Amino acid sequence: MTMPFYTSPEQLMRERSELARKGIARGRSVVVLKYAGGVLFVAENPSTTLHKVSEIYDRIGFAAVGRYSEFESLRVAGVRIADVRGYSYDRRDVTGRALANTYAQHLGAIFTEQIKPFEVEICVAEVGQTADNDQLYRLTYDGSIVDEPQYVVMGGQADTITTTLKDSFSDGLELAEAAGLAIRALSSGGEGTRELGVGQLEVAVLDRARPNRTFRRITGAALKALLPSQEESGSTDGEASGDAGDDKKTGDDKKS
């Protein structure tokens, strides 16, 4: 009689974590950061049909990296939850914190109970009436949730991009300054330096000045005007060239 195969819970959790981290690392990066007028989303995304940045509700936005089908299902679920709560109670009762907690419970249950975890990392952002009330929540594949004070970086080159942001970020940046910083940081990821154009970027904001639905995409000429100049890109690239990481592009049809 053969003994049944046994895997310890610790080993099982390690293997699930490794699977999820590898899937996330294959995705192109996303930067979410606070600026003077609200919250800015900048994603490296050449696709014009598959969005990594989306609206959830009036003052709440969503960004994600990893396996598209999995984080898209989370986005749709979040929209439905927010709509039901806003309809049943009041639109002001729909908050980023409540939605982030719901996502954390869902991701944690999948990680511990299902055979395969979600290969995703997501950010839930909420713009407040003032800059002090803006909120950024980072959620990982296992349901861990962190309230970030300034910015969130997700994806395969997160360490390199975070280093660039840490050296240059300051509170109260204007939109053009924040967008230029985020785009330069994304360009610093990968092997050497790259120049990201309008066709490779997905940019949106939660604009505090808008009265109801604050989410607004920035495309075309408006986005082109936010791109950093050659001189700015060159100076930043020269500083970041020594610690550039690997740019893994395999599986980008499934990993975003």
Curated annotation (Swiss-Prot):
Any inhibitors or activators noted?
The formation of the proteasomal ATPase ARC-20S proteasome complex, likely via the docking of the C-termini of ARC into the intersubunit pockets in the alpha-rings, may trigger opening of the gate for substrate entry. Interconversion between the open-gate and close-gate conformations leads to a dynamic regulation of the 20S proteasome proteolysis activity.
GO MF annotation list = threonine-type endopeptidase activity
Q: In which pathway does it act?
A: Protein degradation; proteasomal Pup-dependent pathway
Alphabetized PROSITE patterns for the sequence: PROTEASOME_ALPHA_2
Report any one BP term from Gene Ontology: proteasomal protein catabolic process
- Originating organism: Saccharopolyspora erythraea (strain ATCC 11635 / DSM 40517 / JCM 4748 / NBRC 13426 / NCIMB 8594 / NRRL 2338)
Q: Identify the domain of life.
A: Bacteria
Cell compartments where the protein resides = Cytoplasm
Q: Which family does it belong to?
A: Belongs to the peptidase T1A family.
Provide the Gene Ontology terms for cellular component.
Answer: cytoplasm; proteasome core complex, alpha-subunit complex
Which NCBIfam families does the record cross-reference, listed alphabetically?
20S_bact_alpha (TIGR03691)
Give the coiled coil ranges.
Answer: none
Q: What is this protein called?
A: Proteasome subunit alpha
Q: Does the keyword Cytoplasm apply?
A: yes
Its quaternary organisation is: The 20S proteasome core is composed of 14 alpha and 14 beta subunits that assemble into four stacked heptameric rings, resulting in a barrel-shaped structure. The two inner rings, each composed of seven catalytic beta subunits, are sandwiched by two outer rings, each composed of seven alpha subunits. The catalytic chamber with the active sites is on the inside of the barrel. Has a gated structure, the ends of the cylinder being occluded by the N-termini of the alpha-subunits. Is capped by the proteasome-associated ATPase, ARC.
